[in-house]
Structures are given as structure tokens and as C-alpha cells.
Amino acid sequence: MREVLSIHIGQAGIQVGNACWELYCLEHGINPDGSIIQDFNKKKNDDAFSTFFSETSTGKRVPRCVFLDLESGVIDEVKNGRYKNLYHPEQLICGNEDAANNYARGHYTIGKEIIEIALDRIRKLVENCSGLQGFLIFNSVGGGTGSGLGSLLLERLSLDYGKKSKLGFTVYPSPQVSTAVVEPYNSVLATHSLLEHTDVAVVLDNEAIYEICQRSLNIERPTYTNLNRLIAQVISSITASLRFDGALNVDITEFQTNLVPYPRIHFMLSSLAPVISLEMANHEQYSTAEITNAAFEPNSMMAKCDPRRGKYMACCLMFRGDVAPKDVNGSVAAIKTKKTIQFVDWCPTGFKCGINYQPPTVVPDGDLAKVDRAVCMISNSTAISEVFSRINKKFDLMYSKRAFVHWYVGEGMEEGEFNEAREDMAALEKDYEEVGSESQDLISNSFF
């Protein structure tokens, strides 16, 4: 079997993880305690669940995942939540002291104490796999644990499991909404690590998803639960082809092969369509062409950047439900004729499509309406560099005054690491600029 391990780090990683496992359980007919819903699997392929779940001798399903945090608050929520009996107690790992929004605490001082325990649990999970395909890593880069401990874990996974794919779902700071003053520092330091130690990183940002919830689902004040359930739908769509049958299934390494033209250019935009509320669903039915167009709308993007201001290098469309290959071909052909959707001239085709017959599942009493067909798009666009430029500007404003730097140095970090990480970000911005430039000749050897 081609198993995938999920690692959820820090508050954002764990809360997104909760929403994902809630959805996977519904999709695979698994109760909150890991038992199987009777008669559910008769109509589905029986071992679909084993990519993400292992099976105990008593027939209980256990998620192949680890939840990791430096303080116990969010892990306690999982331990006392609806799915408390789903996870093995050893999969929920927490320390006693939090990272206090400080990358250096997560990476050097507090993180060092917990990393060996985490790697030991991961090793046990890996030993329980017959053919590990790779890791999914969930974290945010604004806080201390997600950025610091997240980077440390990625570095160690590269050492221990060098050849395995690492796919990151990374929450970046929002342009307007900030949860910590030092977010720009943490983000730049963590991206420096993501560049080297992930193969594909899907960039998410709370503000963009917040606006989708307000606009498309008519939720006046979206909560993290609303946001995370929407993120879970994207992650479920990306991983559906690892778990269910379809006409064109997409493997984790295929994402890499099709989306990443140069190793460093691996930060992806994602979108989902249709996102419709329960009251709208009764009056509307969306065709394959309509949902494909909707996925390319700037408003549908799960990160704050405008793809019309950049060029696409590659694009993965994962369709679910009642979708025929000929409709997909027609929709993609129509997209290619649109002037607003520009591809770089050295990559004229740029589309990878997957079709999965499992229709989208929604959480009962949730905000999303059940639909017959949906599409999730993961695209590699030069527009994503807007996210980095924004963070770099904020970093420069603070770092020019050396504001807050003593908190990092006090935790054993060298000040030179700030400069090194910032230079790497400047190089990344330049890489994106070169890739989007008109001619292939301008692309230098700096990518290799």
C-alpha cells in the first residue's frame, strides 16, 4: 500500500488537522471512536482507507498521524474533543512550555527537548507502513511552534527519510490581520527552511479564506472552525486520488513532477469550487465548465495574491464526483483561450487533470452544501511572490531597527541567521521574477 503520514505542528497545524480527520472519517465511514459504520464499505472499495488509516487487530481504524505542540492547550482540546478515542495516546505529543511566538524557542531551546520523542513516534508509524509514500506537514509560519519546531522537524525528516516526498500545507500571515508582532521574522526564518526541506508547499492564508467564508457562505463572522473545514476540503481533494478510484488518479510524487519546474519554485496557490452555502444549493447546479472557470477566479484563491498579475507555470485540476473526461477536456481548452489566464511562454500546456469518482463529502450541520461535482486547483503561479514581498517589507522595517531581535538571540540563535534567511528570500523573489520573464534564455543556473 502507498501510505501517507500526516504531521500536525502547533495550534494552526493541529486545528486544521482536526478538521481534516473529521472529514476523512466521514468519507471512509469511520465513527469518531475508530469503529466502522456497518454496511458503509459494501458500496466502496474496501481498502481505500489504508493510505491514511491503519487497522488494529480488533478492526479499529487509527489515523497515521502525529499531533505535536510545545504546550498542552490545543492538544487537550483534541484529548477532550469528539474524536478523542480515534487517536492513539502516543500520537498526541506536547511539552509544558510554549514557544511564545518565538522561532528560536521552537527551533533551538524548547523544540530540542521534544523533537526526539516526536521522531521516535514517527519512526514507529513508518515501521507500520508497507510502502510509505511521503509526509504531509501542517503548520503555520507566523507563530513560534509552527515556524521553529516545524522547521526543525522538516530538517530532521530530510536526514532520516531523505527520499520521501514532503508536502507542506503552510498558513502564512495575512496582509491585514496579524496575531503577533514578530510574524515577519518567524515567517522569513521558516520559509528559509521550507525552501530546502519541502518538495511542494501549498500556501494558505486566513484572510483570504475568511473572505471566501463571508462572500460565498454568507457567514458574517467566520470562526477558525469555518476556515479549517474549508481548508480540509482542499486537502481532502488533493488526497482523494490516493484513497479512492478514479479515471485519472494523481499520486503525491506526481504533484511534484507536474508542478515544480525548478526545485525552489515550489510554493503553490490553491482554490476550490463550487463553494456554496446550503440555501444557495437548492437553486443552482454547476456544470464542469462553470466550476473550472470558478477555480481560476482570483476570489477563489486561498492565499491573498492576484494570479492575474502573474503567470502560471503549471496547474493541477482535481475533479471529484460526476465528471466526464470529455467535459474536462472542453473546460481546459476554454480556459486556454482566455486572455486573463496567462502561462509562461516556455510551458505552453501546463495542465495536469485528475478525476475521482468519489463525490465531495460535507460535514453534517456544516456550512458547505453537498454538491455532485467539485474541483480543487493547485497551481504554480509567479503571483505567489506577492506573499513573500509583503512579508519581506515588514521584516525589513523591523530589522532595520533590530527590533525584538534580542528575544531570538537570547534563545541561542545567531543574529547572522536573520541575514542568511532574508538573503534567501530576496533570491526567491528574484527567482520568481526570472521565471516569469519573457524568454527561457533569461533563466539562469541559480535554480539548480
From Swiss-Prot:
Its cofactor is Mg(2+). It comes from Guillardia theta (Cryptophyte). Coiled coil: none annotated. One of its GO terms (cellular component) is microtubule. Gene3D superfamilies: Helix hairpin bin, Tubulin/FtsZ, C-terminal domain, Tubulin/FtsZ, GTPase domain. It comes from the Eukaryota. PROSITE patterns: TUBULIN. GTP binds at Q11, E71, S140, G144, T145, T179, N206, N228. This is Tubulin alpha chain, nucleomorph.
